[in-house]
A protein has these predicted regions:
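Active-site/acyl-donor-binding loops of N-acyltransferases
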Residues: 2, 13-16, 124, 128-196, ...
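Catalytic phosphate/metal-binding cores of nucleic-acid and nucleotide-processing enzymes, i.e., regions
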Residues: 82-84
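Aromatic (often tryptophan-rich) hydrophobic motifs at membrane interfaces
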Residues: 104, 259-378
Length: 390
């Protein structure tokens, strides 16, 4: 138990109902939890054991100041666990005394058998506006070579506090590096929606994007919201996209079916599958997730043929409009690479997202810390070596 002001803070396991009620409360909403910290995410991740923890004056009565979904993965041959809080915990990072809740959290996880903990603090570190980056591309250039539009003082302060307490940034602190040690993207792309009209959003698109959206409309591309029955077609198109663009997510149809069912059981409509049809054929499919006042474009897939009718642009424009209509403050297009080199294959994804007129955000990334004791430190080193071999 740690004091907060004049009131002690208690950390303990809480029910999913209590957890969700906090996320939906004004205080919880202000902390901006992502879908990876919702209780439903535990049902998506096979092979992990989940803990729902809360802290505050009286967690069991719902008097909370923060919560965390913790995923535990057992280290082979031991009774020890790696504790992972994807894009969490959901906490007030503005509090300079992070020990008041972080200390009890780490102690609880140590007693639960964790040998190390990985967290994903929510504050941003740097931001680059699309208008700034477009003229600054070139051979060998990376985001870190460009002076940011904004450096977030909170992100800088949180990073310093974590380092002072023995945390290490996964993948290191290299300028412009993509955060290869992170499980979640270090660089993401945001389109602000708060205070903007749909006309503002349209004006924010670059000329190429507006032309492509109009082309899709002229060609008769129809955008509809699908259902779970359309997930097999989404996965088929995703396999096509992976082959074409040279990446591999490694997620099966069963994974997406589990995700769709779990997120929508928690809140109907939380995850939607958008389809772009042309002449009766599905040419592209994208997933949209909403939590509170945030919306995420999670995964996109498209066919190799008839790309000239621009189904993906049509999908994204519809999804932007729907997120705006739902009252979202931010549309998160998820990960982008750090390269500004048009000669690199990965740059195409960044270029496409820049066309929406948003901004690249460098998050604080993920941070790890072994929990006290030589045995835990040794297990952590062995676990890091295991991850590098994968």
């Amino acid at each position: 138990v740690r004091p907060v002001g004049n009131r002690p803070v208690t950390l303990c396991p809480i029910t999913a109902r209590t957890y969700r009620a906090f996320l939906a409360s004004p205080r919880g909403t202000a902390l901006g939890a992502g879908f990876l910290q919702c209780p439903s995410w535990a049902d998506v991740k096979e092979g992990w054991r989940a803990l729902l923890l809360g802290w505050g004056p009286d967690p069991e009565a719902g008097e909370l100041t923060g919560v965390a979904l913790v995923l535990l993965r057992q280290f082979p041959g031991t009774r020890k666990y790696f504790a992972y809080l994807p894009e969490g915990p959901v906490a007030d990072w503005r509090d300079p005394d992070v020990d008041r809740w972080l200390g009890p959290l780490l102690e609880h996880l140590r007693r639960a058998g964790a040998f190390a903990v990985r967290i994903g603090p929510s504050p941003a570190y740097r931001r680059w506006d699309a208008a700034l980056l477009k003229p600054l591309t070139g051979p060998g250039r990376r985001l870190g070579d460009v002076l940011a539009s904004e450096v977030d003082p909170l992100g800088t302060a949180v990073a310093e506090r974590l380092r002072a307490r023995g945390w290490s940034r996964c993948g290191g602190d290299g300028t412009g590096d993509d955060g290869g040690g992170d499980a979640q993207p270090r660089y993401v792309f945001h389109v602000p929606l708060a205070g903007r009209t749909t006309d503002d959003l349209w004006a924010g698109l670059n000329q190429e994007w507006r032309r492509n959206v109009r082309r899709a409309q002229k060609e008769g591309v129809e955008v509809v919201v699908g259902s779970a029955a359309d997930l097999p077609e989404f996965c088929r198109l995703l396999a096509v996209t992976e082959r074409r663009d040279g990446f591999r997510l490694g997620r099966s149809l069963a994974y997406y079916e589990r995700q769709y069912a779990a997120l929508n059981a928690e809140e109907p409509g939380r995850m939607k599958l958008y389809l772009a049809r042309h002449q009766g054929e599905i040419l592209a499919a994208h997933t949209l997730i909403t939590v509170g006042r945030r919306a995420w474009y999670q995964t996109g897939a498209s066919a190799d043929h008839r790309r000239e009718v621009r189904p993906s642009n049509a999908l994204q424009w519809r999804m932007l409009l729907d997120a705006h209509a739902l009252g979202a403050d931010m549309y998160d297009m998820r990960g982008v690479p750090s390269t500004l080199d048009p000669g690199e294959r990965a740059y195409g994804l960044l270029r496409w997202k820049l066309g929406t007129g948003g901004r690249v955000v460098e998050t604080l990334g993920e941070w790890e810390k072994p929990l006290g004791g030589s045995a835990n430190h040794a297990l952590h080193r062995a676990f890091q070596a295991y991850l590098k071999r994968r």
